């Protein structure tokens, strides 16, 4: 089985991650105690991608939860699916990063990163055939940005042949729904893009053109046809699409997304990503001049 180890760092990353586990646990028929209550064999066929089967038929997420202060960890534990995680996989400090990138990357985060890597190593050792990691974190603040980038660099050093993919996000539910759609091919049986390596081969025409953009439709729960969903997902006004992987669910899929009768998710390799890099560069230049 091709497993994925999930990491979530900082307040934003943990809130998105908690919502993500709620969504995919619901899709796989896993209740908050880790017990399977589904009604389809498809839900269990590739469940080991994100879950480890423990004693007593319990399913435990392959998740590592990280923060530099205990507050977020407490809120995750007290959440609806807080008891499903392995207690040893909560790694947190006491001081916090104070929205300071340098603290998360060089001081407090650097002191905690070895403990995080030990937990990541244990999760990786329990996998039969690890295909990669996914990390949810914010691009601002201290822990998510500072320690998030530190974790990515450390993972690249220790697992150089794995694909590291930071995710995107503002709205937790939208991000978790998009992540659920993107990982559908990995979690359920299919012929196309069944693991991260195949996805990378299909989506990256040239090594340096490896920046993906996600899309999701519909944003409101209403009846749509497949052509209407496709039209909502794509924006042909900005940039040119080099490669696209689209996942349509419910009309042609036995397991629909939660709360929607039909949805579509895509990952696109588009030249429109250059506008994001330009905007970040301009904002950095403006702040640096001050």
From Swiss-Prot:
Please provide, in alphabetical order, the Gene Ontology terms of the cellular component aspect for this entry: cytoplasm; microtubule; motile cilium
* Compartments reported by the entry: Cytoplasm, Cytoskeleton; Cytoplasm, Cytoskeleton, Flagellum axoneme
Keywords in alphabetical order, please: Acetylation, Cell projection, Cilium, Cytoplasm, Cytoskeleton, Flagellum, GTP-binding, Magnesium, Metal-binding, Microtubule, Nucleotide-binding, Phosphoprotein
For this protein, what post-translational modification is recorded in UniProt? Some glutamate residues at the C-terminus are polyglycylated, resulting in polyglycine chains on the gamma-carboxyl group. Glycylation is mainly limited to tubulin incorporated into axonemes (cilia and flagella) whereas glutamylation is prevalent in neuronal cells, centrioles, axonemes, and the mitotic spindle. Both modifications can coexist on the same protein on adjacent residues, and lowering polyglycylation levels increases polyglutamylation, and reciprocally. Cilia and flagella glycylation is required for their stability and maintenance. Flagella glycylation controls sperm motility. Some glutamate residues at the C-terminus are polyglutamylated, resulting in polyglutamate chains on the gamma-carboxyl group. Polyglutamylation plays a key role in microtubule severing by spastin (SPAST). SPAST preferentially recognizes and acts on microtubules decorated with short polyglutamate tails: severing activity by SPAST increases as the number of glutamates per tubulin rises from one to eight, but decreases beyond this glutamylation threshold. Glutamylation is also involved in cilia motility.
Q: What is its main location?
A: cytoplasm
Q: State the PROSITE patterns in the record.
A: TUBULIN, TUBULIN_B_AUTOREG
Which GO biological process entries does UniProt record here? Answer: microtubule-based process
Which residues are annotated with the PTM N6-acetyllysine? 58
Where Mg(2+) binds, per the record, is at 69
Q: Which GO terms describe its molecular function?
A: GTP binding; GTPase activity; metal ion binding; structural constituent of cytoskeleton
Q: What does this protein do?
A: Tubulin is the major constituent of microtubules, a cylinder consisting of laterally associated linear protofilaments composed of alpha- and beta-tubulin heterodimers. Microtubules grow by the addition of GTP-tubulin dimers to the microtubule end, where a stabilizing cap forms. Below the cap, tubulin dimers are in GDP-bound state, owing to GTPase activity of alpha-tubulin.
| Family of this protein | Belongs to the tubulin family.
Q: How does it assemble?
A: Dimer of alpha and beta chains. A typical microtubule is a hollow water-filled tube with an outer diameter of 25 nm and an inner diameter of 15 nM. Alpha-beta heterodimers associate head-to-tail to form protofilaments running lengthwise along the microtubule wall with the beta-tubulin subunit facing the microtubule plus end conferring a structural polarity. Microtubules usually have 13 protofilaments but different protofilament numbers can be found in some organisms and specialized cells. Component of sperm flagellar doublet microtubules.
The record comments on the domains as follows: The highly acidic C-terminal region may bind cations such as calcium.
Provide the protein name.
Tubulin beta-4B chain
Source organism per entry reads Mesocricetus auratus
Kindly list the organism's lineage: Eukaryota, Metazoa, Chordata, Craniata, Vertebrata
């Amino acid at each position: 089985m091709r497993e994925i180890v999930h990491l979530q760092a900082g307040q934003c990353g943990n809130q998105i991650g908690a919502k993500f586990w709620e969504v995919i646990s619901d899709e796989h028929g896993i209740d908050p105690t880790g017990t399977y209550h589904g009604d389809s064999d498809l839900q269990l066929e590739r469940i080991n991608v994100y879950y480890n089967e423990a004693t007593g038929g319990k399913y435990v997420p392959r998740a590592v939860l990280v923060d530099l202060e205990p507050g977020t960890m407490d809120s995750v534990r007290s959440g609806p699916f807080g008891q499903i995680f392995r207690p040893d996989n909560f790694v947190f400090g006491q001081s916090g990063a104070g929205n300071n990138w340098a603290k998360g990357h060089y001081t407090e985060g650097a002191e905690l990163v070895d403990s995080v890597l030990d937990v990541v190593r244990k999760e990786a050792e329990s996998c039969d055939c690890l295909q990669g990691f996914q990390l949810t974190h914010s691009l601002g603040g201290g822990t998510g940005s500072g320690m998030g980038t530190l974790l990515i660099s450390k993972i690249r050093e220790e697992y150089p042949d794995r694909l590291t993919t930071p995710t995107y996000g503002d709205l937790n539910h939208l991000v978790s729904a998009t992540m659920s759609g993107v990982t559908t091919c990995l979690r359920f049986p299919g012929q196309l893009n069944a693991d991260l390596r195949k996805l990378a081969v299909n989506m990256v025409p040239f090594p340096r053109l490896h920046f993906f953009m996600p899309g999701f439709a519909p944003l409101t729960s209403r009846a749509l046809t497949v052509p209407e969903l496709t039209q909502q997902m794509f924006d042909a006004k900005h940039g040119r699409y080099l490669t696209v992987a689209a996942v349509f669910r419910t009309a042609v899929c036995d397991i629909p997304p939660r709360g929607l009768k039909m949805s579509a998710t895509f990952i696109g390799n588009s030249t429109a990503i250059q506008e994001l890099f330009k905007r970040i560069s301009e904002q950095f230049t403006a702040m640096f001049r001050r």
